[in-house]
């Protein structure tokens, strides 16, 4: 069930008692989630934990078995998928791709590409883009909606460390300039520590949630990802605090 107004009037997106079953199998069970303006929420979890199913439910591509998803009135959603497969034989430029399924004003296209760091690619062939360039074009396409909520489903999968870092820099810039909330599925756990306000660890149910350092020290998190990962996250968090102190 989708409602027009979240029960929590401060939230722009609200999920309550969400359950998704396929063929009698529980994919998601009793999921509760609130998303607030300009907040960055990250979903983490092992493969097959239901992360992508939750994202597809939020954008309306999957209908929940029970429960509700409520979005505040007039809130626009931008979506960046994990990967989009295009026929490499199609002679399609970035400009043509970003105008599908309908044309947008040229200035709007230019601004979206600029905000995504892809302005130099407007005449490039989609088939010739690198992985990082392709994802920036997908981000630009999502920004054409001028989103209040930006949802990313493992949008950096397959990118190298440099490409991943550059992509997340654009996401942070977009969050500030658009004032949007960001909900992202990520396997880049060190990025979670640097960028997320709130983390949900999903394994069919929400195993644990909270600030990144709270989740990293949770027994449920450590059971899924191991003590070594928690130590790595603590290391990144420590250096993040050092950077903030030096900046001050």
Which residues make up each language-model segment?
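Conserved ABC ATPase "signature" region
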Residues: 107-121
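Conserved ABC ATPase signature
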Residues: 125-129, 133
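Catalytic Walker B motif of ABC-type/P-loop ATPase nucleotide-binding domains
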Residues: 150-153
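H-loop/switch region of ABC-family ATPase nucleotide-binding domains
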Residues: 186-187
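H-loop (His-switch) and adjacent beta-strand-loop-beta switch element
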Residues: 199-211
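ABC ATPase nucleotide-binding domains
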Residues: 217, 224-248
């Amino acid at each position: 069930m989708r409602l027009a107004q979240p029960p929590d009037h401060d939230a722009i997106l609200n999920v309550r008692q969400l359950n998704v079953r396929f063929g009698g199998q529980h994919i998601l069970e009793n999921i509760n989630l609130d998303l607030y303006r300009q907040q960055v929420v990250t979903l983490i979890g092992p493969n097959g934990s239901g992360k992508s199913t939750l994202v597809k439910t939020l954008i309306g591509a999957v209908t929940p078995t029970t429960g509700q998803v409520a979005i505040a009135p007039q809130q626009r959603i931008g979506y960046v998928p994990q990967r989009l497969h295009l026929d490499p034989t199609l002679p399609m430029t970035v400009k043509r791709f970003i105008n599908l399924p309908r044309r947008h004003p040229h200035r709007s296209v230019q601004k979206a590409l600029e905000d995504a760091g892809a302005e130099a690619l407007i005449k490039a062939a989609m088939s010739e883009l690198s992985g990082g360039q392709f994802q920036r074009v997908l981000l630009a396409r999502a920004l054409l909606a001028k989103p209040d909520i930006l949802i990313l489903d493992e949008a950096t999968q397959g990118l190298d460390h440099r490409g991943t870092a550059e992509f997340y820099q654009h996401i942070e810039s977009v969050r500030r300039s658009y004032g949007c909330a960001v909900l992202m599925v990520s396997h880049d756990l060190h990025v979670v520590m640097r960028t997320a306000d709130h983390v949900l660890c999903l394994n069919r149910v929400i195993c644990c949630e909270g600030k990144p350092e709270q989740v990293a020290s949770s027994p449920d998190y450590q059971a899924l990802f191991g003590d070594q990962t928690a130590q790595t996250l603590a290391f990144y968090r420590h250096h993040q605090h050092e950077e903030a102190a030096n900046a001050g």
